[in-house]
Amino acid sequence: GKLLRDIAFWTMILSGTALLIIFVKAMWKRYVHLQSQIPGLEKNWVADNAHHCIASYKGSKVSLKNVRDFTWSGKRDHNSKWIDTSVDTDKITDIWYVIDHFHKIKGLAHTMLTFEFSDGQFITFSFETRREVGERYDPWLGMWRAFELYLLVATERDALHLRTNGRKHKVHLYRVQTPPGKDKALFNALCDRLNSLGEN
């Protein structure tokens, strides 16, 4: 009796260890494969991230080309519109930290930053995955960097309405307190990151 139980116990341990080794090796091969892939901008992207925004500077004025300004009537239904606009970073009045609770588990959320300007403009930055047509986002593959990184620049109306009206998510906004001049520095840093992604 005891000998058979010991044999069964160690058989289970060895089998579990073997399965774990096989799993880790498979994940490592997958990781190496994904790291060897070269990201690119010229692909058949889905409509909501079809264009990459580019920023250009002239003093405190920043010109933004390809800002998304969709009107959403559902999770996927929308009227496509991409605009070019200019903002003056000296006229930033507020920064809003946006938390999109997209899952029933409260700890899972997507975050964005919205910059409010004294001329009434609201520009939102959101780091997202860039998907090709027919490709679905998978959080597990996202952990292994299987998707191109995409910095979306959109009007706040677009970015928030997609989540509150289209996807029916709970969204919270918090005003960000920054030292003098840091709001402008943060906006410019995001634009620099935007341009660096556009060079890949």
Predicted region positions:
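Active-site nucleophile-His-acid catalytic modules used for acyl/amide transfer and hydrolysis
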Residues: 157-200
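Hydrophobic alpha-helical transmembrane segments
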Residues: 2-14
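Short extracytoplasmic
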Residues: 47-83
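Alpha-helical transmembrane signal-anchor/signal-peptide segments
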Residues: 34-54
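A short, structured loop/turn motif at beta-sheet edges
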Residues: 57-61, 116-119, 181-185
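Selective detector of the "anchor" transmembrane alpha-helix that sits immediately C-terminal
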Residues: 13-21
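Glycine-rich catalytic cores of cysteine/serine-nucleophile enzymes that process amide/ester linkages
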Residues: 62, 73-172
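Membrane-interface motif at the C-terminal end of an N-terminal transmembrane signal
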Residues: 20-41
